Structures are given as C-alpha cells and as structure tokens.
Amino acid sequence: MTIGVVGRKCGMTRIFTEEGVSIPVTVIEIEPNRVTQFKTEETDGYRAVQVTVGERRASRVTAAQAGHFAKANVAAGRGVWEFRLEEGEFQAGDSIKAELFTAGQLVDVTGQSKGKGFAGTIKRWNFRGQDNTHGNSVSHRVPGSIGQCQTPGRVFKGKKMSGHMGAERVTVQSLEVVRVDAERNLLLVKGAVPGATGGDVVVRPAVKARG
C-alpha cells in the first residue's frame, strides 16, 4: 500500500539512543486524516483515496467544497490531498493516523520550501564570485556572460540566472522514522524536512524502498 498521510511540521529537536548517540529529528504532527472520497477504476478511471485535515470555518468554504465535505459526512478541512492506491478499501469518513508507519521505516517527505524572494546567482545557484581586486569594479557578484553572440543569438532555456528562489514543492527521500507516538499523533523523522515550522507536509512510504 502506497498511501501516505498529511501532517504538520512542528520543528526539530534531538533524541538519544540507549548508547547515548544524539539523533536530530523533525517532529511531524499527524492530525487524523479524514477520508473525503474513495475513487475507483469504475467511477474515476483509477484507484485513489482523498483526505482532508484540520478545520476551516464555514464562511471560508465555497458551496462546492461544503457539498463535497457534507457528502462524505466529515468536517470541512483546510485542503484536500489525494493518494494513489494499489490495494485496500476505504470509506468516506474513515480516519488515517500515525499508526500507518512503524519505527525504522523509510519515508519520503514532501513540502513547500521556505521562500527566499529574489536571489542572485551566488545564493541561488552557488556561483563563485569574481575577483575583489585586479581591476574588477562593481562586478564582484554578477554572473558574467549568459551566452554567445549572433550564433545562436539567444539565451538557452534553463540558463541559471537570478530570480525567485524557494517556495516550491520539494521532496526529501528515504528518511528514517525514528519513533511513532500514537498517543500524541507524532512522527519523529531523522533529519530535516522541507518547509517552515507549521507548514503542511506529506509523508509517504519511500519509493526506493518498496521493492
């Protein structure tokens, strides 16, 4: 089963093993994922389960969204997420919690990276700076040439240049689940995960560990 869960990044801390080894971990709160729709090949052309988390005021929900949540008999959430499903059955209103994962399991975590605004090539692409002296003036952090002359007469697509940095979908693969706290609905994942504290993250079984 490749289904995952939607959680909220709480921040980072560290825990110690019995041998005294310090392990940096990210704490992810797994609020109950309420199933809003179960899609099948007969009705939708593919198998998937759609979930929502959290709560949203009725004044912040459109009529279409309110009808969708009411049909599933679940409270309106702050969004909907979908997971493709190879096997298993779910019903609208079911709840998916942190017990889906076990300690030692490898997971992929997806989130939105922190926005950095408009960034230059040194910060955005790790370009080296130009000479500080030796005749260089006002060009210490500029990227330099961005192409050739009349042939080809254009800048190639994908050229690394200054621009907006961050605030994009990022996935970190094969992180180890160090601990599962079912009582408090917490996952402790080894290492860092994308995004700022309080941001939504999607935790799935690692694609490279599915065999």
Swiss-Prot record:
Could you list this entry's UniProt keywords, alphabetically sorted: Methylation, Ribonucleoprotein, Ribosomal protein, RNA-binding, rRNA-binding
Report the GO terms under cellular component: cytosolic large ribosomal subunit
**Post-translational modification as stated in the protein's UniProt record:** Methylated by PrmB.
UniProt superkingdom: Bacteria
Name any one GO molecular function. structural constituent of ribosome
The answer to whether the entry has keyword Ribonucleoprotein is: yes
Name the GO terms of the biological process aspect. translation
Against Gene3D superfamilies, the record matches this protein to: 3.30.160.810, Translation factors
Q: Where are the N5-methylglutamine modifications? A: 150
What's this protein's function? One of the primary rRNA binding proteins, it binds directly near the 3'-end of the 23S rRNA, where it nucleates assembly of the 50S subunit.
Q: Which PANTHER family match?
A: 50S RIBOSOMAL PROTEIN L3, LARGE RIBOSOMAL SUBUNIT PROTEIN UL3C
**Quaternary structure annotation from Swiss-Prot or TrEMBL:** Part of the 50S ribosomal subunit. Forms a cluster with proteins L14 and L19.
The record's family statement is: Belongs to the universal ribosomal protein uL3 family.
The molecule here is called Large ribosomal subunit protein uL3
The species this protein belongs to is: Pseudomonas putida (strain W619)
- State the taxonomy lineage: Bacteria, Pseudomonadati, Pseudomonadota, Gammaproteobacteria, Pseudomonadales
